[in-house]
Amino acid sequence: MNFETIIGLEVHVELNTNSKIFSPSSAHFGEDPNANTNVIDWSFPGVLPVMNKGVIDAGIKAALALNMDIHKEMHFDRKNYFYPDNPKAYQISQFDEPIGYNGWIEIKLEDGSTKKIRIERAHLEEDAGKNTHGTDGYSYVDLNRQGVPLIEIVSEADMRSPEEAYAYLTALKEIIQYTGISDVKMEEGSMRVDANISLRPYGQEQFGTKTELKNLNSFSNVRKGLEFEVERQAKLLRSGGAIRQETRRYDEANKGTILMRVKEGAADYRYFPEPDLPLYEIDDAWIDEMRAQLPQFPAQRRAKYEEELGLSAYDASQLTATKALSDFFETAVSLGGDAKQVSNWLQGEVAQFLNAEGKTIEEIALTPENLVEMIAIIADGTISSKMAKKVFVHLAKNGGSARAYVEKAGLVQISDPAVLVPIIHQVFADNEAAVADFKSGKRNADKAFTGFLMKATKGQANPQVAQQLLAQELQKLRD
């Protein structure tokens, strides 16, 4: 029997506001344990939450970017559960009226086809703290993360393979990152993924019993965990077994999933409206204000790069991998840079430099202005392509004018025959054995002179001009 795979994803995205959702504590990552906390985060008696408007702004932007309807009257709810990293014993979240609902995004698969994935809802909530279980037998609670604003994006169960789930996450991350509401760094916990997967016989309408997957700390592990579950569940069903509703975690070392707990039924969180927060009205003016702040998204930029700038689909995809890179490219082209040349540099030397340095394009000194200037002085023959690599490294580390650096460092390419011909004659005088080999007709003897000339000019001879002049002067030797 063959089975159809059914996948839905729940993605938690931390919003990059300066302060937390209901308290003035800093929401920044990486501080000492409990440094970013106050009496609200610790749930002291009598304290009340105060809404951070920037969180609603971010929620509206996310909803618009994901083609969602927006609840014009929005409220928060209490989700009741006890855990040490949740001192209130409830989480402030949204239940029946999330900020966004009924959305969709389009994904692109490896074969080039596209598919629309529906999004059920996106709701705002506060993050919980973090428990650390020490080797000394004690557990430690860090509430820095408590109250950091989240938006949870819940897809419909529209994905039919691990490949589609991977493509959905890739597209979702791109879109969220372009809005500017989150840096979506999985390694820092600002993007977290839970997956729900079930199998059903082809032709059956009813979903099978789902398994929830956690501990998915990369898109690659999401894919691997889902692939493992497809095989595990199919094997179990074919042998006459039944799938239990359970939560499993992906174990990277064993390349498989491990049981965490069995779910006897749906959890009862006893949701009820949060009495300490008002109803929030989101009018059209507010929505329009947030819409005006949104950029052009990756899909639209890729289409523009292919149709208007003549780039390949691959180049367009690489250039839109991050908003910062895409913005850099667009600025460079607007300054007169050739689109293909700028693209080649960004995907070649620039990408290699960033990987080697472990930095992003915003963190180096290179600017669109000095990259375009460098490309221009390659085109006009001021420097060679080989010399340009040295110039680029200087610009990436120090910035400044490409032309000014080339002139100051004495890197200007020598193209004047009046300068090169005397140097060629000196090369002949300094290499009599090579001249003798050439005159005697020794095979490939002429090629040695190119290296001699480049050495004599410290690599500054224009290769094309040098080859032409060498051929002329060598012919004179032969005559």
Swiss-Prot record:
Its EC number is 6.3.5.-. PROSITE patterns: GATB (PS01234). The keyword Protein biosynthesis applies. Disulfide bonds: none annotated. InterPro entries: Asn/Gln-tRNA_amidoTrfase_suB/E, Asn/Gln-tRNA_Trfase_suB/E_cat, Asn/Gln_amidotransferase, Asn/Gln_tRNA_amidoTrase-B-like, GatB, GatB_C_1, GatB_Yqey_C_2, Gln-tRNA_amidoTrfase_suB_CS. Keywords: ATP-binding, Ligase, Nucleotide-binding, Protein biosynthesis. Belongs to the GatB/GatE family. GatB subfamily. NCBIfam families: gatB, PRK05477.1-1, PRK05477.1-2, PRK05477.1-4. This is Aspartyl/glutamyl-tRNA(Asn/Gln) amidotransferase subunit B. It comes from Streptococcus pyogenes serotype M3 (strain ATCC BAA-595 / MGAS315). The gene is gatB.
